Amino acid sequence: TARLTYAIKTTSQSGTFDGDETITQATTGAVGKVVEWDSSNSIIYYTQERFGNYGTSSTTGGKVAFSGANVITGATTSATGTPVAAADTAVTLAGGNTLTFSDGYANPEMAADSGDIIYIENRKPISRSSDQIEDIKVIVEF
């Protein structure tokens, strides 16, 4: 299984990062949202988008990448972690994939906005009542 999230390998962390928690790096002004905290490997999986409080700097309004050995702090849990300063570190994940970190940071394993839509089915709208419950199933294959 490949991920479309950025990753930070941390050392000397305190606390546990929660999913959907905003993380910041004060020195750089980087902002992101935690997707998953892998406590066994000390890896923060996160995303950044070009929306306020989700990936853009409140000062510049631009997307700022996490970088350097600056402390990363969780907004709600106050958990902290310092990125590993090693040049290249490879971590083998539970599924067998290997994630290579450069100075504590790893890019997504898949490229965003790449790929092809192989099937679209257009249907007419169906009227629903406001108290009706629906099950939605989505199949995604890579």
Q: Could you say what each language-model-derived stretch is?
A:
Residues 1-142:
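Interface-prone segments of viral and bacterial extracellular assemblies
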